[in-house]
């Protein structure tokens, strides 16, 4: 499963190699646009002067993925192609493979044709390469920007959600809490990596990391499943016969994810302490995500009508959109050098209603309708943020979202 420490490492505003690229500060507009929905007046100043710092020690990235992406940029992609268009194209591949899987395996347990698994693997491989190529395209055309970084980060967050559903179907986890766990594992790592970057100001990917080796594991499993069939995942494990192979894989993934989350926490706390600040206080920033995890897990485990059985993807999509919006807000706060505001309206509405339902304070009524309502709220809020934040940053930076800036 994806064990990504941060998709931002592949962002267009910085190379993944061990270096720091300074984005040329943009001139401050003579007339500052007012009434921004997401960027404050002070945030505008920091956005214009933003610099991203990061490194990637992955051998797979440096010896395979990066050279492939560079060749693609040098010999295939037109210099007129906007980096953000490459990002959207890459995300479209994994979304399309997800839709195809949905058609053949609506309950995440049906066996799909072998080519469906192969298509999912190739789509994820192309996504990985294009996710690096967009950054190289941005640097080649002189279009690196905070907007590109945030755009890339948002697409990577959505990839976590979509790929989790596709992967759960591939290893036949079905509409059970195991499918929720296979989504929560990479989501936890992604959120904690973003949280770590918020407090340290940089992101250093180790020699083995999610955006590279994690994705390699995923598309390798897709290809193997296409060859041997998915039923191998429902067979008893040799070492732990009381568990199926897919359950053992989920447990390994969760264990790895928890370890990476603890590592991120230690790095962030030590960074705060070196700045003579209270490191433990930084942990407050992860409380909304912890609440999201706990309430979603409780809902799946104690749902009166076992709603996850009927709507497994819908619930994962709903929780995933809230998660994606959280990491977008945290990344924006990092770039604007502002406090990360915990109590967002979208999250609070669902948090309060979920608590009232789980606690039995208010009746469930038609539970499926509640999930559908939450999905509409989550999707609307996410689309609202993506649209207005993208246009605001484009206005601030004086660039076009899907057009290469000449000169």
Residue ranges of model-derived segments:
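Short, flexible/disordered secondary-structure transition segments
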Residues: 103-110, 133-140, 161-165, 175, ...
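Structural signal for hydrophobic/aromatic residues that build the beta-strand cores
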Residues: 72, 82, 131, 135-138, ...
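Membrane-embedded alpha-helical segments that form the functional core of polytopic membrane enzymes
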Residues: 88-149, 163-164, 178-189, 249-253
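Juxtamembrane "helix exit" motif at the C-terminal ends of alpha-helical transmembrane segments
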Residues: 93-109, 168, 223-229, 355-362
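C-terminal membrane-associated helical module and adjoining short loops/tails
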Residues: 2-78, 186-407
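Histidine/cysteine- and/or acidic
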Residues: 121, 137-211, 219
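N-terminal signal-anchor/initial transmembrane insertion module
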Residues: 44-113, 117, 128-129
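Alpha-helical transmembrane segments of multi-pass membrane proteins
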Residues: 90-94, 156, 349-353
